[in-house]
Amino acid sequence: FAVLVLFSTVVQAQSLDKLFRKYADDERFEYTSIGKGMLGFASIFADYSILTEGQMEKITGFKMLKLEKDSAYQELAEKFMNDIDAIIEKGDFETSLVKREKDRRIYVYKRVDKRANADMLLLSKSNTGINFVWLKGKTSDEEMDRIQFEKERQAKEEDIL
């Protein structure tokens, strides 16, 4: 069973990697990737648990894709959103935040495996473009306990129904 859980976590992370590789070299996208070394250096100046509101204690990877909306890119924007939606749906992500403004939508999704490895996705859609950010790292012990408690509570509710 543990091997199956580990395998599914690896496959899900590969799906995110595959999505970023797919669009990273496309000239119509702005792509940013910050590796573990640079993030380690940045941690000297910033507390990641504060920046992520306690959800991530350590960030080991940061990737961002940005697509400016243009009528010529409408089909590409739809395909990009379909790819993102598929990853979120298949990846067992929990919705942490949904914010709707007049001309913009912001979504934050997260998932944590049994070893406290965490992925946080930030998606911003507006009339002018799409921004998709992937933060990879470790969650805090407190957040891990909260997630475990929430999963147990949901399982009990499902048993009652």
Describe the residue ranges of each PLM region.
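Bacterial Sec-dependent N-terminal signal peptides
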Residues: 1-19
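Contiguous interface-forming segments/domains that mediate binding rather than catalysis
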Residues: 21, 88-92, 146-152
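Extracytoplasmic
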Residues: 26-29, 57-62, 90, 101-103, ...
